[in-house]
Amino acid sequence: MRELAWVLPTVAGEIAHWRSCAAAIPDCRLRADASANLHSSRLNAEGAALFAVLPRRRHSALVRGLVAYQTALDYLDTLSEHPCREQQVNGVQLHRALAEALQPSGRLSDYYRFHPWRDDGGYLPALVEAARAGCATLPAYERVRELGIASARRMRVQALNHAPLPERRDAALRAWAAHEFRGRDELAWFEWTAASCSSLSTFVLLALAADPQVQEDDVLEAEAVYFPWVCAASTLLDAFVDQRSDREEGNHSYVEHYDSPAEMVDRLCEIVYRSVHGARQLRNGERHALIATGMVSMYLSKASARSPELLPATRRIAQVAGSLPRVQLPIMRTMRAVQRLGDA
């Protein structure tokens, strides 16, 4: 855990920088979205920056790039939720930013082309350029670039999540998964789309690229563990702990596609186990395991995970993740409490 002693202060500085940028956004609605995301998604940024512990040497530019990318992702997800005439087209256009953030150069798209509000004062392009700048410092970036861009393009599936009619949404997601993962039966269609929504496979590739000695086999083996297993675990656990709020707000919940609560818990346990076990088998496996279990602990540390209806499942999931969550969960709960106190 000593690695967090330098990562977290760097994250705090980056978040403060982006908060000042968000506060200067001319359009009041975009300004509210950007500011609210930086307030509510701080743990997401800290989780992204945790990937900076993978390289043996400290790489501050990697942290800055990871935070910028995660901040852009959270902001885009919120923008995609706003109803508009071309909602799916709008979401796909907005999410172009994720792939372009991983391209070393090139003209940026008009991300707000189909969005009802446009004047962000350069906020989203600045996030994209900050992520690009982080990539440019990585000595082995060319070895991971194509896989990273492919991961970013998969994340466009998030645009389908916000379709106003559940029947059309589910049909679109099912068709997308059938096309993208034809012949692969490790996961159900909704588990594939859940995995594709996650940025964790992108983050591990960026972290590996910080090592000038990284080999192609190391990259491919890590990619195979993070996508689909770690990515699926991340999105599904997020849905697991947010079940009640998603129902109340009418949001799409991936875990509602399971046939029963028992099946949901069984599958979550299996996917979490595959994530953590696979991470341990990688080169520098202890650090990958720290990240995989840290992700599990981040979600299970949420207060809703300890509600009477979820607590038995929470305990079972934490158990299959091994011994590290016993240390990580109290730390994550404390971090959440400190954040709430700071916001009071």
What do these predicted ranges mean?
Residues 252-277, 291-302:
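C-terminal, helix-dominated tail/subdomain
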Residues 294-344:
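Acidic, carboxylate-rich catalytic segments that either coordinate divalent cations
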Residues 8, 14-48, 62-63, 93-244, ...:
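All-alpha helical catalytic cores of prenyl diphosphate-utilizing isoprenoid enzymes
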Residues 72-83, 234-245:
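Acidic (Asp/Glu-rich) catalytic motifs at the cytosolic membrane interface
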Residues 80-92:
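Short, glycine/acidic-rich hinge or "gate" loops at secondary-structure transitions
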Residues 243-258, 314:
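Active/binding-pocket-proximal capping segment
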Residues 48-60:
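Post-signal peptide N-terminal segment of secreted/secretory-pathway proteins
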Residues 282-294:
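Transmembrane helix-loop-helix
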